[in-house]
A protein has these predicted regions:
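Asp-based, Mg2+/Mn2+-dependent phosphohydrolase catalytic module
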Residues: 1-6, 17-19, 39-43, 91-94, ...
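Surface-exposed cleft-lining segments at the edges of enzyme active sites
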Residues: 99-108
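Short, flexible/disordered intra-domain loops and linkers
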Residues: 18-24, 61-68, 216-221
């Protein structure tokens, strides 16, 4: 077994999701703010959130992070305080963020065969890790609702660390915290830039999945780099689609 540790992206790799952060969602979130005396229109709340997030990202980028990640709930809490609502602002920020996520989510589901595939890979001796550009304030609950948490040996979410893929420091968080041998790790993700280029820069082998959530400007999987077709010893492979039962069997051949 060439690899002992499999590192997964979440959305677009294990989980199929569609969100619509449209005007109606902002209006509903603004209504929640108004319940507590923080009065915004939907458009004003969206503008204030975007401006506050950009300011925080700029400050983080100027200090040390190439790809900063700001917890959304902190920004929501700031917007409550901007309207003079200081009591329990942090808790209100959490609630507002979760409300926004729920209101904007049209569907959230595992790709077919994910749980079975993870169980099969675990039975073959692999350790399974999650490394996701995600917000703990809602992703932790989504993992629980989908039954994914119990299948994983460890979870790293970018909002906990202030940086996100493709920043090599985020990959190193997992390597260092868990004592992993980077030469025995395979990163599996659906984004050539954040997942694949970032992992390669950090020294991991990579498996690119071209799924329905891969950015539309990114190429489909190259058949010449498919598992079984790529040259022996190759540390990058590509896979078209999200058939996890089939993919688990292929991974086991590496």
């Amino acid at each position: 077994m060439t690899y002992t540790d499999l590192v997964f992206d979440l959305y677009g790799t294990l989980v199929d999701i569609h969100t619509e952060e449209n005007d109606a969602v902002w209006e509903k979130t603004a209504l929640y703010f108004g319940y507590y005396g923080a009065h915004y229109t939907g458009a004003a709340l969206k503008e204030a959130f975007t401006r506050a997030m950009a300011a925080r990202e700029a400050r983080a980028g100027q200090s040390y992070e190439c790809f900063p990640d700001i917890p959304f709930e902190q920004v929501m809490a700031e917007l409550f305080r901007d309207k003079g609502v200081t009591e329990k602002a942090d808790a209100l920020g959490v609630n507002a963020t979760q409300l926004f996520r729920i209101a904007s989510t049209e569907y959230l589901r595992l790709y077919p065969g994910v749980l079975e595939a993870l169980a099969e890979l675990r039975s073959r001796g692999y350790r399974l890790w999650l490394l996701s550009n995600a917000q703990r304030v809602f992703t932790a609950y989504e993992l629980r609702s989908l039954g994914l948490g119990r299948q994983l040996d460890g979870i790293c979410l970018s909002s906990d660390y202030g940086c996100r893929k493709p920043d090599v420091r985020f990959f190193r968080v997992l390597m260092e915290e868990r004592g992993l041998d980077v030469s025995r790790c395979l990163m599996i993700g659906n984004d050539r830039e954040t997942d694949i280029a970032g992992a390669q820069a950090a020294g991991l082998a990579t498996l690119y999945m071209h799924t329905n959530l891969t950015p539309p400007d990114q190429a489909a999987a190259d058949p010449a780099l498919a598992i079984g077709a790529a040259p022996a010893g190759n540390r990058h492979h590509e896979y078209e689609g999200s058939d996890w039962i089939r993919l688990a069997g292929l991974i086991s051949t590496l």
